[in-house]
Curated annotation (Swiss-Prot):
Domain of life of the source: Bacteria
GO molecular function: DNA binding; DNA-directed RNA polymerase activity; magnesium ion binding; zinc ion binding
E.C. number(s) listed in UniProt: 2.7.7.6
SUPFAM superfamilies membership: beta and beta-prime subunits of DNA dependent RNA-polymerase
Name of the molecule in the record: DNA-directed RNA polymerase subunit beta'
Residue ranges that the Swiss-Prot or TrEMBL entry lists as coiled coil: none
Residues that bind Mg(2+): D450, D452, D454
Cofactor: Mg(2+); Zn(2+)
Record: residues binding Zn(2+) 1: C60, C62, C75, C78
Gene: rpoC
GO CC annotations on file: DNA-directed RNA polymerase complex
Amino acid sequence: MVDVNRFKSMQITLASPSKVRSWSYGEVKKPETINYRTLKPEREGLFDEVIFGPTKDWECACGKYKRIRYKGIVCDRCGVEVTRAKVRRERMGHIELKAPVSHIWYFKGIPSRMGLTLDMSPRALEEVIYFAAYVVIDPKDTPLEPKSLLTEREYREKLQEYGHGSFVAKMGAEAIQALLKRVDLAAEIAELKEELKSASGQKRIKAVRRLDVLDAFNKSGNKPEWMVLNILPVIPPDLRPMVQLDGGRFAASDLNDLYRRVINRNNRLARLLELNAPGIIVQNEKRMLQEAVDALIDNGRRGRPITGPGSRPLKSLSHMLKGKQGRFRQNLLGKRVDFSGRSVIAVGPTLKMYQCGVPREMAIELFKPFVMREIVAKEYAGNVKAAKRMVERGDERIWDILEEVIKEHPVLLNRAPTLHRLGIQAFEPVLIDGKALRLHPLVCEAYNADFDGDQMAIHVPLSEEAQAEARLLMLAAEHILNPKDGKPVVTPSQDMVLGNYYLTMEDAGREGEGMIFKDKDEAVMAYRNGYAHLHSRVGIAVDSMPNKPWKDNQRHKIMVTTVGKILFNDIMPEDLPYLQEPNNANLTEGTPDKYFLEPGQDIQEVIDGLEINVPFKKKNLGNIIAETFKRFRTTETSAFLDRLKDLGYYHSTLAGLTVGIADIPVIDNKAEIIDAAHHRVEEINKAFRRGLMTDDDRYVAVTTTWREAKEALEKRLIETQNPKNPIVMMMDSGARGNISNFSQLAGMRGLMAAPNGRIMELPILSNFREGLSVLEMFFSTHGARKGMTDTALKTADSGYLTRRLVDVAQDVIIREDDCGTDRGLLIRAITDGKEVTETLEERLQGRYTRKSVKHPETGEVLIGADQLITEDMARKIVDAGVEEVTIRSVFTCATRHGVCRHCYGINLATGDAVEVGEAVGTIAAQSIGEPGTQLTMRTFHTGGVASNTDITQGLPRIQEIFEARNPKGEAVITEVKGNVVEIEEDASTRTKKVYVQGKTGMGEYVVPFTARMKVEVGDEVNRGAALTEGSIQPKRLLEVRDTLSVETYLLAEVQKVYRSQGVEIGDKHVEVMVRQMLRKVRVMDPGDTDLLPGTLMDISDFTDANKDIVISGGIPATSRPVLMGITKASLETNSFLSAASFQETTRVLTDAAIRGKKDHLLGLKENVIIGKIIPAGTGMARYRNIEPQAMNEIEVIDHTEVSAEAVFTAEAE
């Protein structure tokens, strides 16, 4: 059998009239749809069975031939072929138009393709097509210009002047068709190329545009006259169905109405032509036909849209494709699936990390086919029908079978919005009572789920391959690290943190202090019987824990610890050191010696000499998990996480921490602090009234005063807090709340934002314990409302940003092992002024070196070229005092349509080298988009006079960077490398002038008077350096410097925004996105190549075009790099399917059709649209057609890491 989906590429072209006829199964001549009495399709109508096929399987219209045995026979009575009814989704008809009609996409689009081909303005075209003017087609011997327009009156005058038949002029689409037929593509192209050599300015731009379109026609084999239709295809009837509603009425697709209008007008025109009606009547009918076809193809593109009942515009063919509800985004990129369900989620604290609880009723419905198969196999029922009845009856025996069926059959759980790949994970189902899905508490963070009524969807993978993938690649227990930064995403939260915090507290003088136990069991027994407290410091024999990595001098001794810490260390992986202190030294280097008793030493003496340790907080638990993962990988880590969870829940229950109003302390000197602030504000206002400061200065001073007062209260609160206060414990452990919540409960609420976003000068002096006055309450509602609306707007903005990012990078896949490039990226720590945004150590981890790294003092080679830098290696490099390293980077990768493994480095989600087939583009887009909601919306005011411009931050700044827009608050940059020799202020024009002396000459830059300078006289500056504060315009930087410096700048800018909000994102994700913005070049001079000047093309295509020319000794083309925003880059992608499904569908398809574009289906989106397996992961060609070997040929090696993909592919075969 031929697999219809195994094709290499897909092409779109203009349809020639002969092509349309070859598709068609007959002409639709009548506007009728179905007979309202018999409900059968009318002959020669829009639903005719003769043309489109039978409405019932294997049955002709009159009923003479029924059953499959007559397959392929055409009925002699009704003329209907006996076949499947499904052909009504495939067979097309056609309408023979009695007058040519222009296709609105090619005449109306921007730029008008018809206009460019004919070198006529769109307005002139419109006048001709809609019968407002004549156009001269052939002037013969008259002095008329070809393509010139004549009004009705001028036409008559010219006819009288030159005589009938002395020239040819027509109106309507036929005139345009005649002109298009006369276009000599080769001659026009040669002429334009000649003109381009001398032209400049507007004239050149126009010539380049025309050349582009004419060249497209020339190369694609499309004929320009096909932009005018003589024959109209009719799409299959099942794609524009009529459905009977209850009540006898019909709901029909709008397309039927639009087709009916076309047929009616076409038939009327045919009759008028037969009757030889007067020209003006025929003309009017032709114009109406043109409008009817326009409405069918794209209703509302020209003039008022045609409306149906209730003045609703009808949905035309174009609208069927466009937008979120269009064919692309609604049905092709995402479909509804069966074997799925959704329900509210509840917590499942007893589940293992790879399990989820599925309600019985839900499971029986989801796994019905599997259960039925088993029933038949066990011979409880004779056939599938009986088995189905058994399941529906709820027979007792089905539950045991269900248990068997779901064993080892993973299911997928998804929570909307799915912001990153951790939004869908696989679990093994466990049957439970009730109606809610049970979710493991640790995976909540990845899903961003909580149990206040969230719902989740469940899906069943059906095929063996799908099950294998779910189990090997998507199991929740495997997803411990977050792909965006490589940090653990499954850290314990809330109660689990609190329990472990309480467990690891230490306290002096509690019962049992100084007791010595032989092992853990004895200590636990003492604690259970009330002889020792959880927090008491006691001794334990080191030898009772022989597997721990003790130092030699620590063995056979007694160690001081607490009962709680004995329990805490009991759940740790054996090879981790015994944890006494919540710091990295203890975790990586081992337990400090001070906790061990020397022989004969008194334990109480040692205890008294030790400081009381702080307990383990959320951050410390995160570090322990990361270390565990680094050493033992997933299996051990997920088991450890489950133990940590159980211990945390158990002890937070025992601790029984609660919050009462008495737990909120009263600050003793609150009144003094507030009085002092009032006094200071009064002084400021007095100074303002005397005219000693401006209103802006006064506002800043007042708000600063209140802010300082609030901070003073906060400081006092921290100084006086009791570490055993439950609120303090919750806050300190990181379980819930932070110091700002605490200070609003106990200190003062402070300054509030007014509805316009400006901070009000009147602070709220009360705190929640004292209670707010009515006025204070009213003030605080402004901020609360603003917070809610901001969040709602931000979510939509952030979602749209993610969609654009995914679209631009979806075809970036790891394609090969090593691209062999000789370029690299020199990196150092990213700084913002004096602050370090991202350290060199962070940037080095998990990357490959480009050159070897040497110790700056000793010259010893720390690491060779093209080696992977591990976490420890990165620390070693930084400790040696190295400040910059050249690494392999996505920016400089030479792989086409993707990235190679060495330029990418490790996969942050697994901590191992990335595998070929990983869809790194999508992961990068999700990693940047997912934290988008955490970024702020507002544009900050830097306060008062000092600000020259508002610096954009947060989400708007990220959008500004990725869309390559000109930034707000733009910095002035220098184009000269040299020294700043002078900065002169010109008071009359309120500007400053900066002079930079370079080798090639002096650069003079005018800077606004208020701008804050970044340079001083005598400073050395590089090309592209900013002279003033603010953001550099990247397009400008690209003109002054090279591509790499723009990429480096954009990377640093994105990181600044995210890091300032406390969000960490791996550099490589930003690199992938930024690289996609710089994939194109614009051809400046084509040299000896056949490229067109001004064309935008992919860097790799441009290099290819030049390669052949250089080899044959010709002059290569020159080009200039182009920086594109992500939206523009998505639309300029080589795949027209991907671009059309993103935005501006009609424009993309119009352009692709004229060029006869081929889509080679390299990206993920294109393959999803046509229903092929995506070319990433196990779907890559190299993993698919694998020949299985016999088992005895394969060498079996113990303890080898096998990639999940390899395992799966072998199973799939």
